[in-house]
From Swiss-Prot:
Belongs to the chaperonin (HSP60) family. Forms a cylinder of 14 subunits composed of two heptameric rings stacked back-to-back. Interacts with the co-chaperonin GroES. It comes from Protochlamydia amoebophila (strain UWE25). Together with its co-chaperonin GroES, plays an essential role in assisting protein folding. The GroEL-GroES system forms a nano-cage that allows encapsulation of the non-native substrate proteins and provides a physical environment optimized to promote and accelerate protein folding. The lineage of its organism: Bacteria, Pseudomonadati, Chlamydiota, Chlamydiia, Parachlamydiales. Its main location: cytoplasm. This is Chaperonin GroEL 3. GO terms for biological process: protein refolding. It is found in: Cytoplasm. Keywords: ATP-binding, Chaperone, Cytoplasm, Isomerase, Nucleotide-binding. GO terms for cellular component: cytoplasm. Its EC number is 5.6.1.7.
Length: 534
């Protein structure tokens, strides 16, 4: 029998969505900026998590009202998209969403057309994003890298210094991982390792469901230069792995069919500790990259061309690494057991191929391979006195690292909400009429939200300081640390352009969906449940 449904319409529906979004945004609002506060999250066991990271706070929020919860789900999607794309800016994204939806609903209630408002918002966002891209300054020095890292770590100088140092040690070619240390001191170590752009083949293989990643310690690594569809091919390896109790990472051309389904079922049952990813590259380049990974991990590539079969695989064919981390989009291998002389010989071979390369494309790809093999992985081991402090510091390191990477990709802009404010000034050039003009004005007002919130969290009047900033030169803004309006670029208060433009883009996209929503449908409350709550 189908479950009865409840339906609410138009203004009532939008108001419920807004209530959910506002509750969620209100929780994270006071965490914004270097003088933002913390939020405590109850855990079913152990110490509570104390954090000022918007994504961590928002992730577990579930409201009692089913319609408000739909609004929360929409806000969560914005935060998740920003987190995946940039790693930072989640709190600003939630505040922008609240501002856009609140102003949009207010105007719709006054008779404006939702479609016209959305069209105007889309045009305004496009103009603001282009202005941010135009204003972006490339990151060239270690000091600029450090400044971005410090700002993203809520002004923590130690974290900024360590992230900048790690970046310098491995350059753009290497990878950086953040781990929990065993003492109170935080340290950096560069180890043999590699990162490549291939994620897990199934999310059901994740070991850390909170972050949706696979984490393995002292894992064995199987490299296969073909597609695996039948579980029978893998049985000898899986039986040996299960007997040893070690974790296994499979890197193959592809894994599907009953091979994948059996791996997933056994992983969920706890019978096997296994993960699988597709091999990086295509064709001959894939074969070469598999050989690079084999050199790094002391493995042998299982290939029919070499006369090695999966069914009769020698024990020595499996490589190993101290730590493996697999996300939705990438795989990082840390501490491979390959001999240093073998890695050096492999790099020398790639150098020879670079010298012989005819096309610039081939040369570029070979240089990428060389960089991955020689760059290594910088491991930052975070030290803290308590578990609660450890979790908070590790989260700050993660945010700082993600922001710094974003800054290196697309450049920096003045921080403290000033980049959005400056970019929104270009909306005066946009000649719109009617409801489209209303939509553009809503975006203009939303762009003032982050700076006003940062000022309020510092203990000042947001509107008063905003007026002072609007009458100041282009890069001037409110520095929450010094509590005065000054040149933020010169003061080192900077944000990654990529983060700023994506927070606005994703917030506006979801706001448009909310404004165009005319009805909400949910399961009807059970009569017995209603009576029991009375």
């Amino acid at each position: 029998m189908s479950i009865p449904k409840e339906i609410i319409f138009e203004e009532e529906a939008r108001e419920f969505l807004l209530k959910g979004i506002k509750k969620l945004a209100d929780v994270v609002a006071f965490t914004l900026g270097p003088k933002g506060r913390n939020v405590g999250l109850e855990k079913s066991w152990g110490a509570p998590t104390i954090t000022n990271d918007g994504a961590s706070i928002i992730r577990d929020i579930q409201l009692e009202d089913k319609y408000e919860n739909m609004g929360v789900a929409m806000a969560k999607e914005v935060v998740q998209k920003i987190k995946e794309k940039c790693g930072d800016g989640t709190t600003s994204g939630a505040l922008l969403l609240r501002s856009l939806v609140e102003a949009g609903i207010k105007n719709i209630s006054s008779g404006a057309s939702p479609i016209g408002i959305k069209r105007g918002m889309d045009k305004a966002v496009e103009v603001v994003v282009k202005a941010i891209e135009k204003a972006a300054i490339p990151v060239k020095t270690k000091q600029e890298t450090r400044n971005v890292a410090v700002v993203s770590a809520s002004g923590n100088q130690e974290i900024g210094e360590l992230i900048a140092e790690a970046m310098e040690k491995v350059s753009n070619s290497g990878a950086i991982t953040i781990e929990e240390g065993k003492g109170t001191e935080t340290s950096i170590e560069v180890v043999k390792g590699m990162k490549f752009d291939r994620g897990y083949v199934s999310p059901y293989l994740c070991t850390n469901l909170e972050k949706m990643i696979v984490e393995m310690d002292h894992a064995q690594i199987l490299l296969v230069d073909k597609k695996i569809s039948s579980i029978h091919e893998l049985l000898p390896v899986l039986q040996a792995t299960a007997a040893s109790g070690r974790e296994l990472l499979i890197i193959a051309e592809d894994i599907d069919g009953d091979a994948l389904s059996t791996l997933v079922v056994n992983k969920l049952r706890g019978t096997l500790k296994v993960a699988a990813v597709k091999a990086p590259g295509f064709g001959d380049r894939r074969k070469a990259m598999l050989q690079d990974i084999a050199t790094l991990t002391a493995a042998t590539v299982v290939s029919e061309e070499l006369g090695i079969s999966l069914k009769e695989i020698p024990a020595t064919a499996l490589g190993s690494a101290e730590k493996v981390t697999v996300t939705k989009e990438s795989t990082t291998i840390v501490g491979g057991t390959g001999a240093q002389e073998d890695i050096a010989a492999r790099i020398k071979q790639i150098d020879a191929e670079i010298n012989l390369a005819q096309s610039s494309y081939d040369k570029e790809k070979l240089e990428e391979r060389r960089a991955k093999l020689s760059g290594g992985v910088a491991v930052i081991r975070v030290g803290a006195a308590t578990e609660t402090e450890m979790k908070q510091k590790k989260q700050m390191f993660d945010d700082s690292l993600n922001s710094t990477k974003a800054a290196l990709e697309e450049g920096i802009v003045p921080g403290g909400g000033v980049a959005l404010l400056n970019a929104s000034k270009t909306l005066g050039q946009l000649k719109l009429e009617g409801d489209e003009a209303v939509g553009a004005k809503i975006v203009l007002q939303a762009c003032e939200t982050p700076i006003k919130q940062i000022v309020q969290n510092t203990g000042f009047d947001g509107s008063v300081v905003l007026n002072e900033v609007l009458n100041s030169p282009a890069n001037f803004g409110f520095n929450a640390l010094t509590e005065k309006v000054e040149d933020l670029i010169a003061a080192g208060v900077i944000d990654p352009a990529k983060v700023i433009k994506n927070t606005l883009t994703y917030a506006a996209s979801t706001a448009g969906i909310v404004l165009l929503s005319e009805a909400l449908i949910a399961d009807a409350d059970d009569e017995e449940e209603e009576n029991s709550t009375k």
